[in-house]
Swiss-Prot record:
Protein name as annotated: Translation machinery-associated protein 20
Oligomer status and interactors: Associates with ribosomal complexes.
GO molecular function: RNA binding
Chain's gene name: TMA20
Single Gene Ontology BP annotation: nuclear-transcribed mRNA catabolic process, nonsense-mediated decay
Native source organism of the sequence: Eremothecium gossypii (strain ATCC 10895 / CBS 109.51 / FGSC 9923 / NRRL Y-1056) (Yeast)
Length: 181
């Protein structure tokens, strides 16, 4: 999604009203329940949250010069910089070592890379299809990508073929290297 992204893709940049900020907070907590503990630390009442409208109907939400999350269609998706600050707040999957170089180049994640010995998926009941997940790698401390499940984790385990996760944002892509300043 962010293979080609620059300041030229920005159309408008406006301050968000406090009522909109409250609804965004509740939407974030609804989508990621574990964020409830840190949501007031993340977006304090007097924080100036900005919405940055970009091409391809992408909206970035930033505090100061840091993009915290973005929106394409309905769902809010955290940036990796935000995930690195609050890693325990998001659903996580783990890939094996062999898939790292492919994910870092923006490739979607295949099911065998999620079911091999170095990989890990959440225990039952698992995650539903279309869930936003943080992608960690075997023996690595920080997340390397944000993705969207193309099938449930139970289906990934049972089918074990095809694409399992669509990579939306990864280390080294244009959003990772993007600066608002």
């Amino acid at each position: 999604m962010f293979k080609k992204f620059s300041k030229e893709d920005i159309h408008t940049r406006t301050k968000v009203k406090t009522s909109v900020q409250r609804s965004l907070k509740s939407k974030l907590v609804e989508q990621f329940p574990k964020l409830e503990e840190v949501i007031d630390e993340l977006l304090p009442k007097k924080t100036e949250l900005q919405i940055i409208k970009c091409s391809d109907k992408i909206q970035l939400y930033a505090v100061g010069d840091e993009v915290l999350f973005f929106q394409k269609f309905e769902e809010l998706i955290p940036t990796l910089r935000f995930v690195h600050k609050y890693p325990e707040a998001f659903p996580t999957i783990q890939i094996d070592r062999g898939a790292i170089k492919f994910v870092l180049s923006g490739a979607n994640i295949m099911c065998p890379g999620l079911t091999s010995s170095g990989a890990a998926l959440p225990e039952a009941p698992g995650l539903a299809q279309d869930s936003i997940v943080v992608v960690n790698a075997e023996n690595k401390e920080n997340a390397l990508a944000i993705g969207k499940l193309l099938m449930s984790t139970e289906d990934i385990k049972s089918i074990n073929k095809g694409h399992g996760v669509e990579t939306i944002h990864h280390l080294g892509d244009c959003l990772w290297n993007f600066s608002l300043v």
